[in-house]
């Protein structure tokens, strides 16, 4: 199990990009933290492992 924003989810084995796609999130507008560390967008092909704690932060434009 992977914990995503505090909720357990069976996402181990997915890459970060696959996870974002499954959640209908836009990678360019989503910051990803794994284990409390910000993941650079260049590493979004990283595979999630059992026990990873992931936080997703979406950005919305506006004015």
Set out the residue ranges of the language-model regions.
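Ubiquitin-like/PB1-type beta-grasp interaction modules and other compact soluble beta-rich domains
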Residues: 1-62
């Amino acid at each position: 199990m992977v914990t995503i924003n505090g909720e357990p989810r069976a996402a181990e084995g997915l890459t970060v990009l696959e996870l974002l796609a499954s959640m209908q999130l836009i990678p360019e507008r989503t910051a990803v933290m794994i284990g409390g560390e910000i993941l650079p967008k260049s590493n979004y092909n990283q595979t999630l492992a059992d026990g990873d704690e992931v936080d997703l932060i979406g950005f919305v434009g506006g004015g």
